[in-house]
Amino acid sequence: MTLLVRMSLAMVTLCLGVACSGPLQLANIQVGRALNQDRSISSITTLFKPNETIYVSVQTTAAGKGTVSVKWKYGTRVIDEPSKQVNYDGPASTEFHMQNSGGFPPGDYSVDVLIDGVQVGSRTFKVDRYFE
């Protein structure tokens, strides 16, 4: 086989692998105050102090590509809607975080998780100024 033929076959294989990656599928949603190196949550919790950074890790099951978005809410009011375009070769975690330099108001919060614009899950958490 000539070098040109081998390179062409390698390119076709690579292109098929990328084109055949399916949509992302949710495995788990974690909320907490710290991350591991793989972007999963190392300190899972649903109770935060007003000055803490709040992390959410969206874990997907297998290779896939798409848009992962979160909708952070305080009560029913949407406070942020970040999104990330991702393309993973296998199971992975996509991280989002929220912080407020002036501190979060105490109360009930939630984060909705969307994959390609479709809500796939939600988590609730609370900010409490008396939490030690």
Q: Each PLM stretch: what is its role?
A:
Residues 65, 106-108:
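Extracellular Ig-like/FN3 beta-sandwich strand-entry sites
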Residues 70-74, 113:
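Conserved aromatic beta-strand anchor motif in extracellular beta-sandwich/beta-rich domains
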Residues 53-61:
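Short edge beta-strand/loop segments characteristic of extracellular beta-sandwich folds
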Residues 20-50, 131-132:
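Short, compositionally biased P/S/T/A/G/V-rich stretches that sit at domain boundaries
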Residues 88-98:
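Aromatic sugar-binding surface patches on proteins
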Residues 1-20:
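Sec-dependent bacterial lipoprotein signal peptides
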Residues 79-89:
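Solvent-exposed serine/threonine-rich low-complexity stretches and specific carbohydrate-binding patches
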Residues 101-103, 110-127:
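Short, exposed beta-strand-loop hairpins at the edges of beta-sheets
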